UniProtKB/Swiss-Prot annotation:
Enzyme Commission number, as recorded: 3.6.-.-
Localization per record: Cytoplasm
Organism, scientific name: Brucella suis (strain ATCC 23445 / NCTC 10510)
Record keyword Magnesium present: yes
One cellular-component annotation, GO: cytoplasm
Protein name according to UniProt: tRNA modification GTPase MnmE
Subunit structure: Homodimer. Heterotetramer of two MnmE and two MnmG subunits.
Keywords carried by this UniProt record: Cytoplasm, GTP-binding, Hydrolase, Magnesium, Metal-binding, Nucleotide-binding, Potassium, tRNA processing
Binding, Mg(2+): S235, T256
Annotated residues for binding of (6S)-5-formyl-5,6,7,8-tetrahydrofolate: R27, E84, K124, K442
CC cofactor note: Binds 1 potassium ion per subunit.
Length: 442
């Protein structure tokens, strides 16, 4: 990413989807935006009004004719002069327009996330809002979209700014007691009240972190692993859940050697379902590796579906794991004398029990996620800094034998950690990581 702070260049990029398309949108931002208009359109449109103009190269050749909008600074997404050119979405048209823009002095193609990074640098958004926009663009389910919108709407920033202000106010009381202890207009010994306020804030942050676990599940998805002996019907179940033939189905035992994963959208919640190698004793080195991977994936699962053929000898065994495990009896169409041993009975041949199992999976996912609050930490970066904030608050509260100056310093550090979440203080080292998650043109 280019050096942040100066932004002498004017950047441009294709912001719409893959070509060819009905319409292609090219965005521009920077100090040369008006010059671009004068060169390519020979006119600057009325601000915020669509104008139908011909776009020309520097030698006067017409590139295309389309709509364009001019947005003068500072009331724009980036805070700079901005423009949009709406062209026909042919590959040759767009490539020619981009080439012409690249030939103009002071103009260059934007890097990934550079429009949003400029918006951050110019005070148009904080880091949590930028991260929310990245999540919104990446959202694939309704639940992920809602969560991303909550963050992008600024709810996190409001909460963290309020907490930071409470820390600053508390620290001001302590420093007032230090500096003006002999003055009559300073309340006597405000320290006790401050520690009580900090204790309440600490509990709020702890609760907030706990709610972040559910948000992380919604953002990253829940993981369901299908296990069982060879030919228990694992691959058939995966194919049903996926709605297509993902796994090879064969009478030959041990067909599945590696992990096969599909992504489901269950009520707006992303759920990753993994088919694994059949669990059994084997001399095959390749199959052994597959079984080891299956056991490793089980250890990371939120839910394990343990399948057993109901038509064969009953030998229900479940490996000891922390994840919740459901016993699923398969091949129900072939009968079975011990059906009460299993939580669900299914048949991929007749479809019996499959919709019931799918409904149960959705109910499990919804219960696991629960009700997401308006402001939750959605990134591990947030949680790490919140934990660091709590640690400094605890030092301040519990430091009875320490000078007030040191406890005030703990409070300063706590407010600084909160400021790092929103980008108000000392975040240069993480900017490249955050904004590289955006596509070019955003």
């Amino acid at each position: 990413m280019s050096e942040i702070g100066s932004y002498h260049d004017t950047i441009f990029a294709l912001s719409s989807g893959r070509l060819p398309s009905g319409v292609a949108v090219i965005r521009i931002s920077g100090p040369k935006t008006r010059f671009v208009y004068e060169t390519i359109c020979q006119a600057i449109p009325e601000p915020r009004h669509a104008a139908l103009l011909t776009f020309r190269s520097r030698n006067g050749d017409a590139i295309d004719r389309g709509l364009t909008l001019f947005f003068p600074a500072p009331h724009t997404f980036t805070g700079e002069d901005c423009a949009e050119f709406h062209l026909h979405g042919g590959k040759a048209v767009v490539e020619k327009m981009l080439a012409v823009l690249g030939e103009l002095p002071g103009c260059r193609i934007a890097e990934a996330g550079e429009f949003t990074r400029r918006a951050f640098a110019n005070g148009k958004m904080d880091l949590t809002i930028a991260e929310g926009l990245a999540d919104l663009i990446a959202a694939e389910t309704e639940g992920q979209r809602r969560l991303a919108m909550q963050v992008a709407s600024g709810n996190q920033r409001k909460l963290y700014s309020e907490w930071r202000q409470r820390l600053i106010n508390a620290r001001a009381f302590i420093e007032a007691e230090l500096d003006f202890a002999d003055e009559s207009d300073v309340p006597g010994s405000v320290s006790m009240q401050v520690w009580q306020q900090l204790s309440a804030l600490k509990h709020e942050i702890e609760y907030h972190i706990a709610s972040g676990k559910r948000a992380a599940m919604l953002r990253d998805g829940l993981h369901v692993v299908i296990v069982g002996a060879p030919n228990a019907g694992k691959s058939s179940l995966l194919n049903f859940l996926a709605g297509r033939d993902v796994a090879i189905i064969s009478e030959e035992a041990g067909t599945t050697r590696d992990l096969l994963e599909v992504k489901l959208d269950l009520g707006g919640i992303p759920v990753y379902v993994t088919d694994t190698a059949g669990l059994r004793e084997t001399d095959s080195l390749v199959e052994k590796i597959g079984i080891e991977r299956a056991r490793a994936r089980m250890a990371e699962a939120d839910l394990v579906l343990s399948l057993e053929d109901m038509s064969g000898p009953v030998s229900v065994t479940v490996e000891k794991i922390e994840a919740e495990t459901w016993l699923i009896g398969t091949k129900a169409d072939l009968g079975g004398s011990a059906s009460g041993l299993w939580k669900y009975h299914i048949s991929t041949m007749t479809g019996s029990g499959l919709e019931q199992l799918l409904d149960a999976l959705q109910a499990f996912a919804e219960a696991k996620i629960g009700q997401i609050e308006d402001a939750v930490p959605t990134r591990q970066r947030h949680i790490n800094l919140l934990r660091a904030t709590i640690e400094e608050i605890e030092k301040a509260i519990e430091g009875d034998d320490l000078p007030l100056e040191l406890r005030a310093e703990n409070m300063r550090l706590a407010s600084q950690f909160l400021g790092r979440i929103t980008g108000d203080v000392d975040v240069e080292e993480i900017l490249d990581v955050i904004f590289s998650q955006f596509c070019i043109g955003k």
